[in-house]
Amino acid sequence: RLPEPELMVDPAQVLAYAAADFSGGDQRTLDRIEALLRSDSGRAASDPAVILDLGCGPGNISLPLAKRFPESQVIGVDGSPAMLQVARDRADQQGLSIDLRCSTLQDLALEPVDLIVSNSLLHHLHEPGLLWGLTRELAAPGCRVLHRDLRRPAALAEVHRLQQLHCFDAPAVLIQDFCASLVAAFTPEEVQQQLALAGLDGLTVEMEDDRYLVVSGLVD
């Protein structure tokens, strides 16, 4: 594993990321969140009062959640001011109410929340235990959790194959970012070990398609 910078602050990188079409993956994340918010009986559970999106970036997940749950408080947190500005502009354009905060995981102070999500955050972290500790700390009783991220291939040849398959015609900055992110990502086994150390026994790890993993479940 080769870690990459924790924050995306370079203007060219921020603009390229914000302009990229991640709608397919974003929708899969939103669909999983919707399913997670249903009770065991299949009936829709009550809407979460407070939703926390960690590493929210330009709002790809936060903004649809704010639209889907207009009575909920949606809090988007990111350490990059440039990313948050994109999210603010989009929220204004869409007329959405959302609480956007610039903070690192280390400095984040919040009251307990009812739903914690992140999309492509984990691989940025040099200390992944921060995410799991914060998840446990901020989870209200019965909090639902969903973290979706890339998973690291076993060999560099597989990194190249995935790049050719999924972003062969992307801008150079996105190709570089995609490859660096794959190499920086964790394996499902590593994430399972992280969850065990954090005492998050109610969360499970599963693989999604050819390059993602999903951590989800309930925190009692």
Task: Identify the residue ranges that each predicted region occupies.
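N-terminal, positively charged/glycine-rich alpha-helical extensions of SAM-dependent methyltransferases
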Residues: 1-16
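A short, conserved alpha-helix within the catalytic core of class I
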Residues: 125-135
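Conserved beta-strand signature within the Rossmann-like core of class I S-adenosyl-L-methionine
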Residues: 142-149
